[in-house]
Structures are given as structure tokens and as C-alpha cells.
């Protein structure tokens, strides 16, 4: 069983966002961080794009929820099949065509939290050797379950920081305390999950 971070390493942006934090704990706390970040914002604020071609807060949350659905299928294919092909997807098409601006932010976060909980449950019950199994991503090549866990934990943190930037940049009076509380490191309230090795 390998220890430490996955090889090859995850993208720098995500590695920096995660730092030395436990990726499973980071993934477990992400839905609550999102809930705190959107508290006090109106639907109009949540739907406001910070610039042309950039996603709104709701679109970012929908992206996290959509990504979690796809991630769950990747975990399952990799765990159950030998070196399965893992297809990339067009995240901008998802944002444009799946109607995130027509949803309530709280519902999008609930969707994300539900799928995330199911995926964390799967990770907890997988045998340890499954974490080293790989799939062949159409754009990035070999990816193990371990690498996906680290990458998506950093991906969450990256987008939480993006939401914080949008919130404080566009809506500075919406409550700085909420933003500060949302981005502060917290331990999940549930029992700790098995740590990646």
C-alpha cells in the first residue's frame, strides 16, 4: 500500500488549495462551508456573474454537484473494472444546459451533500487496495481513486475560495463574518472516515 500523496501529483492549484489537510475530511466539510457562504445572499446575488464568461455562485455550486455525480461513477468504474476508460466532460455545457440558475442554491447544496455523503460512504467501505486502482481518463491519462480523492478535495477548496472572492468582491455588505466563518478550518461533526494512505 502506498502512502502519502498520489503519483503523479494533482494539479498545483488544487494541491495548494488543499495544503496538508486530510482530503476526506476536507470533502466531508465542503457542503457546510458552502451553506455558510451563501447565507444572507439573495437569489439575485447568487445568480450574478462576476464578469462575462464567468460562473455565478449558483453555477459554481451546481458545478460541484455535477462533478460529484461524475466522480462517484468514476470511483465505481475504477473500483469494479480493470483500467476502465474514463470520459472527460464539458463542464461549461453542463452549466449552460442543466439549469443551475433556475434552482435554489440551498437545493443545489443539498444535491451536492447527498451525493458527496454517498461517495464518502463508498470510499469508507472500499478495500484499501482499491484506492490504488486506476482508470484511463480521456484527457489526463491514468488516475487512481487516491488521486481523485486528493484532486477533488482541492477542487472543492478552490471553488469555495472562488465563491468567497465573488461574495466579498460583489457583495461586501452581505456579511463578512459569514465568509470568515465559512472559510475557517473546521473538523467534520461526524466520526472520521478512513484516511487515505
Where in this protein do the model-derived segments appear?
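Amphipathic, non-membrane alpha-helical segments in soluble helical-bundle scaffolds
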Residues: 20-31, 54-61, 105-109, 146-149
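Short, contiguous alpha-helical
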Residues: 1-13, 47-92, 120-121, 128, ...
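Short coil/turn segments at secondary-structure junctions
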Residues: 14-19, 96-106, 143, 147
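A glycine-rich, hydrophobic loop/mini-helix early in the fold
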Residues: 29-55
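Short, intrinsically disordered, low-complexity terminal/loop segments
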Residues: 194-197
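Acidic/histidine-rich alpha-helical segments that form the ligand environment
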Residues: 25-37, 93-132, 152
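Short, charged, low-complexity loops and linkers
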Residues: 9-25
Amino acid at each position: 500500500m502506498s502512502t502519502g500523496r498520489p503519483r503523479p501529483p494533482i494539479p498545483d492549484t488544487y494541491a495548494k488549495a488543499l495544503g496538508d489537510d486530510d482530503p476526506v475530511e476536507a470533502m466531508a466539510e465542503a457542503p457546510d462551508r458552502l451553506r455558510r457562504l451563501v447565507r444572507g445572499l439573495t437569489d439575485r446575488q447568487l445568480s450574478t456573474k462576476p464578469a462575462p464568461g464567468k460562473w455565478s455562485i449558483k453555477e459554481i455550486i451546481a458545478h460541484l454537484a455535477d462533478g460529484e455525480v461524475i466522480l462517484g461513477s468514476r470511483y465505481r468504474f475504477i473500483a469494479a473494472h480493470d483500467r476502465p476508460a474514463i470520459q472527460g466532460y464539458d463542464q461549461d455545457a453542463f452549466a449552460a444546459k442543466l439549469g443551475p440558475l433556475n434552482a435554489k442554491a440551498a437545493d443545489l447544496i443539498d444535491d451536492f451533500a447527498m451525493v458527496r455523503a454517498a461517495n464518502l460512504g463508498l470510499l469508507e467501505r472500499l478495500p484499501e487496495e482499491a484506492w490504488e486502482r486506476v482508470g484511463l481518463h480521456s484527457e489526463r491519462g491514468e488516475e487512481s481513486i487516491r488521486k481523485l480523492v486528493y484532486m477533488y478535495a482541492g477542487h472543492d477548496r478552490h471553488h469555495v475560495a472562488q465563491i468567497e472572492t465573488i461574495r466579498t468582491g460583489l457583495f461586501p455588505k452581505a456579511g463578512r463574518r459569514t465568509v470568515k466563518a465559512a472559510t475557517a478550518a473546521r473538523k467534520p461533526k461526524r466520526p472520521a472516515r478512513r484516511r487515505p494512505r
